[in-house]
């Protein structure tokens, strides 16, 4: 343990010295050793983490940074979202050099262009692009199964090892345990006030995205037993409870900012929050088909063009978590989410949910511009 801590402190010192000397803030700050497994980068929630883990890799979610872009505009059109541009920043400046490879998904045009830039300018041993269908149908299931099979073959070719069904099944069990544990944490938000904040939830999910699930599961079990004790509802808590929906949010400070404006965020309809863990895999003899079915039929994001299903899910979660309203946030240039706003708002208002739409550039510097609107929304919900 002492040896590990020494290595940890030395790593932090080296990183700080590097930042001071070069002025480069996009270093490998996240690569604190949590596993001996090589890391495989991924970006989209439709990426089958179980296949990556079964192949012997640690799935590592790529999330860029929360500052204005520095170099991305030299490689890609400026009218792309902060997620893509910040990821290019970190990649170009070497922040992801420790990754063994990256698995992309054709989730939107910006992500496809990110794949193109990465493939050309970022030296990476393994790059794979998953073509996920937009339709939730029997044909779509056949297609996504074929795509998962292509990924499996590509990983086997790269590692020179066959991915056995036993390994896939073990990975499924491991990640399903992670999802179950997350739901146990999420249930703490049913209390009034919530026993855990939205900021803490995003921090916990972010840890999951970059940790070995074996270690993450053990840590969460310990925290559930010791840290999160059952407490009665508080009397007189008047903070309105809301759902946060929209584009991906990786920085917990964004959630913290909303909560500081007088709201309790109790569910995230986000691919980086609660919704990410709302996935159930029914194992069968054909494990690739089981994975394909689970991922294809998960609660859809805007990219899947299932706006009625998304609205229905938000309404169901609103009833479950007893919320009064929804903040739907979208990144600038995030076309798939911006396109949905008018119809989604209409569907939610029909169900007596108040909706606030906010658009940001994805940087923490833009938060103060939204403060007045969020505080006003909080007052409306109180009354």
What is the role of each PLM region?
Residues 2-4, 11, 342-383:
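Peripheral docking tails and interdomain loops at the edges
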Residues 2-38, 145, 149, 153-279:
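A charged, amphipathic alpha-helical module
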Residues 20-28, 33, 41-45, 49-50, ...:
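Metallocofactor- and cofactor-centric catalytic cores in central/energy metabolism, strongly enriched
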Residues 44-63, 245-317:
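Redox- and metal-dependent alpha/beta enzyme cores, enriched for Fe-S-associated oxidoreductases
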Residues 68-77, 136-141, 274-281, 366-368:
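Short, charged, surface-exposed secondary-structure boundary motifs
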Residues 76-93, 303-316:
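Glycine-rich, highly charged phosphate/nucleotide-binding loops
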Residues 86-157:
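Acidic/His-rich segments in extracytoplasmic proteins that coordinate ligands and/or metal ions
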Residues 307-351, 356:
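C-terminal hydrophobic structural anchor segments
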């Amino acid at each position: 343990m002492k040896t590990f801590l020494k290595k940890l402190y030395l790593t932090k010192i080296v990183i700080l010295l590097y930042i001071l000397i070069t002025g480069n803030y996009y270093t490998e700050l996240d690569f604190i050793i949590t596993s001996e497994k090589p890391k495989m980068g991924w970006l989209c929630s439709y990426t089958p983490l179980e296949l990556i883990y079964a192949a012997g890799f640690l799935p590592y979610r790529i999330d860029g940074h929360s500052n204005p872009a520095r170099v991305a505009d030299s490689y890609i059109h400026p009218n792309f979202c902060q997620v893509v541009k910040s990821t290019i920043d970190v990649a170009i400046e070497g922040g992801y050099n420790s990754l063994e490879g990256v698995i992309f998904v054709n989730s939107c045009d910006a992500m496809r262009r990110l794949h193109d830039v990465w493939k050309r300018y970022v030296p990476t041993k393994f790059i794979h692009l998953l073509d996920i269908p937009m339709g939730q149908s029997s044909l779509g299931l056949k297609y996504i199964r074929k795509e998962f099979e292509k990924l499996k073959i590509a990983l086997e070719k790269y590692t020179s090892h066959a991915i056995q069904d036993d390994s896939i099944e073990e990975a499924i069990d491991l990640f399903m345990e992670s999802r179950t544990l997350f739901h146990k944490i999420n249930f703490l938000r049913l209390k009034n006030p919530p026993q855990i904040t939205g900021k803490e939830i995003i921090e916990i999910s972010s840890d999951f995205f970059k940790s070995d699930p074996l270690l993450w599961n053990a840590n969460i079990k310990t925290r559930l037993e010791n840290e999160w004790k059952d407490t009665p509802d508080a009397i007189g808590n008047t903070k309105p409870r809301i759902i946060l929906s929209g584009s991906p949010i990786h920085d917990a400070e964004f959630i913290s900012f909303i909560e500081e404006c007088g709201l309790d965020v109790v569910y995230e309809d986000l691919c980086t929050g609660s919704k990410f863990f709302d996935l159930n895999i029914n194992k069968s003899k054909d494990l690739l088909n089981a994975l394909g079915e689970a991922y294809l039929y998960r609660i859809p994001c805007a990219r899947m063009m299932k706006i009625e299903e998304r609205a229905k899910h938000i309404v169901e979660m609103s009833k479950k978590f007893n919320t009064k309203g929804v903040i739907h946030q979208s990144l600038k240039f995030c076309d798939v989410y911006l396109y949905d706003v008018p119809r989604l708002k209409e569907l939610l208002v029909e169900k007596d949910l108040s909706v606030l739409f906010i658009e940001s550039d994805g940087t923490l510097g833009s938060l103060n511009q939204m403060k007045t609107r969020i505080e006003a929304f909080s007052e409306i919900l109180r009354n």
